[in-house]
Amino acid sequence: MERQFCNQLGIALTADGERKFYIKVTLLVFLVWLILFEAVGWYAVELPTYDITSSVDKQIPLIPQFIWPYLLCYIFPFLPLLVVKDWHRFNLTLLSVIIANLSAFILYFIFPVAFPRPELGQSLSERLLAFLYKVDFHPGANKLPSLHVTFTWIVYLACRGQRLNKLGETIVFFVAALITLSALFVKQHVVADVVAGLGWAFTSWALAGNLYRFLTGPNVDPRTGLRQMMKKLAPIMLLFGVVVFSMMRF
């Protein structure tokens, strides 16, 4: 039943050699991202914050049940591993994520955002949401742009025109839209964060599309292209990491 459903959407269940390789790459990238994200957040949380809550945000209700689609974002970024048919496109996706992160981290330092959280009840959804609030940065950090939203739409862009059929692409689009709305309904982000996250996704994707061919040689296989790309990006990423950890010490 599961295989039949996945075939109807165009999702590949088998893990060939390239897919296994890129699963390892993705897990490594996620680990590095998590370390940097936490480091940036713990530094930014000590900075003066700005409350950019708008009148529109005040009209948006808290709907705790949206915590469930919100949490989909933590597995959604792995979807391209199942649906891409051109691994150069996956390299492009990784490059988009790198561009989005480095530029977002800079803004997190310059313009840290915080806003008050609503009171919660004792339902299962509210308890889960309370846990999310508890583990988040206080009073606030890493909000504008919403990388939750950015990653979601980079995933959508990565999956377009790949193994998914029209039904599959439509489902991915609606899941991306649902995750985006959930960021507002669980009060993890304000409208400005979400709008910026959308802009970050599409801008990072466009920049990556233009940069990728300059970072890789002509007619190389995807693995070689990934190595060439990371070799050229490594000095920039290393310098950024040194700056971040140096700032945390002073």
Predicted regions and their residues:
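Membrane-interfacial, low-structure loops and terminal tails that flank and connect transmembrane helices
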Residues: M1-R19, F214-L233
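Membrane-interface loops
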Residues: W42-K58, V84-G168, F173, L215-R227, ...
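Membrane-embedded alpha-helical segments of multi-pass membrane proteins
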Residues: W68-F76, S146-I154, V195-G199
